[in-house]
Each structure stands twice: as C-alpha cells, then as structure tokens.
A protein has these predicted regions:
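Glycine-rich phosphate-binding loop used to anchor ATP phosphates in small-molecule kinases
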Residues: 51-96
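The conserved Walker
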Residues: 9
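Conserved lysine of the Walker
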Residues: 13
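Conserved substrate/cofactor phosphate-moiety recognition/catalytic segment
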Residues: 18, 22-62
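A glycine- and Lys/Arg-enriched "phosphate-lid" helix/loop adjacent to the NTP-binding pocket
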Residues: 90-138
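Walker A (P-loop) ATP-phosphate-binding motif of ABC ATPase nucleotide-binding domains
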Residues: 2
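Hydrophobic anchor at the beta1->P-loop junction of P-loop NTPases
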Residues: 5
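NTP-dependent small-molecule kinase module
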Residues: 23, 131-193
C-alpha cells in the first residue's frame, strides 16, 4: 500500500504516518528529514528531490508511507502513485496547542520525524506559519486542487476523532485480511472511499 499524508503544520501528519507505517509494514519517509540538515539548514533541492525519487523507486513494489507536503519533492508523482491520501485538515485551534505541546515534549532535542540536530523550536516565524502563512489563500487552493485531481484517493481528516475512526477501520481491514499480497498491500481498502 502507498499512502501520502499531507496537511497543515502541527496537525499530526508525522504521528499518523508513523502509525500507518507500523500498521502496514511499509517504510516511512518524513519529508522534513529530507528538507533539513542539522541545525535547520536546508538541504540542496536537487539532492532532496533525488532522495525522494530514490525512495519512491526503491519501494515501488513494497509500498510506502510519505509524510509531508513539499510540492517540489515530486508531489504530483507521490499523489499519483498513492493508493490513499490522508489530508489533515485540522483547524488552527487544534494545531496551535499541538505545536505548543510538541515544543514542550521535545524541547532541546529533535523529534523522530526531523533530522538529527534540528532541535524542536517555537519561534514567531513558526507561529505565524501555523496561524496565517501556512493557510494562505494560495496554500488552501493548492490543497483543493490536489483533492480535485485525486478525488477517489483523498480521505479528509478534520479532528482527532476522524483519525481514530480511520485507524480503527484500517485495523479491522488488516485483521480481516491478514494475508497480504506479495506487494505488501492491504486488500479491502475500498471501505475507506
């Protein structure tokens, strides 16, 4: 199974992606780990694109879970190849407290979904990204366009309850279909659509 997890910052994309990786047995790629080098330095774009392309090619048959938006990192290919696209469409009133909690939890160290040496931080730029810039009219339109191009694959999650329900459904499907085919795909995912 190939799953893309996209959405707003601090909506829980990385947490969901990690859980989906555990459930499916597929490798997980956190695009923040691709984007950043230690000390929050940005990786060369060509190198980053190459890393994503290599991951997609190496896991073509096995399947994958990819966490993150990053339009420049083969986004259209990722969406086209994905069996499912989870869009974390959480409101600011949920994302901001989650970002503050994450900052407290990982203060002074890197979380699992970011490069080593990128210690968790909360600054004005990131707060503005969560509250305003990351939800600009242009960004919202990009998400709408993506959903219009792949309507049968997108599952919109607007609150934690949606995520729990989705994971419970995937658990049930996996339990009913313990025999995975040779590509690692969970069969029966048509219930999600």
């Amino acid at each position: 199974m190939k799953i893309a997890v996209i959405g707003y910052s601090a909506s829980g994309k990385s947490t969901l992606a990690a859980r989906l990786g555990e459930m499916t047995g597929c490798p997980v790629l956190f695009l923040d780990k691709v984007q950043f080098l230690p000390g929050w330095q940005e990786r060369d774009r060509a190198e980053a694109r190459g890393m994503v392309e290599d991951f997609l090619n190496e896991n073509r048959e096995r399947g994958w879970v990819i966490d993150g938006n990053y339009a420049n990192f083969h986004q259209e290919r990722r969406m086209a190849e994905a069996d499912l696209i989870f869009f974390m469409d959480f409101p600011r009133r949920i994302c901001l407290p989650q970002a503050l909690y994450r900052n407290w939890k990982y203060k002074g160290r890197a979380r699992e979904s970011i490069a080593e040496g990128c210690d968790e931080k909360m600054d004005l730029e990131f707060l503005l990204w969560i509250l305003r810039d990351g939800r600009s009219r242009e960004r919202r339109q990009q998400f709408r366009d993506l959903m219009e191009r792949h309507p049968r694959k997108v599952v919109v999650l607007k609150r934690r309850r949606d995520v729990r329900h989705c994971l419970e459904l995937l658990d049930r499907i996996a339990a009913e279909n313990q025999n995975r085919d040779r590509t690692g795909k969970i069969t029966g995912n048509e219930e999600l659509r």
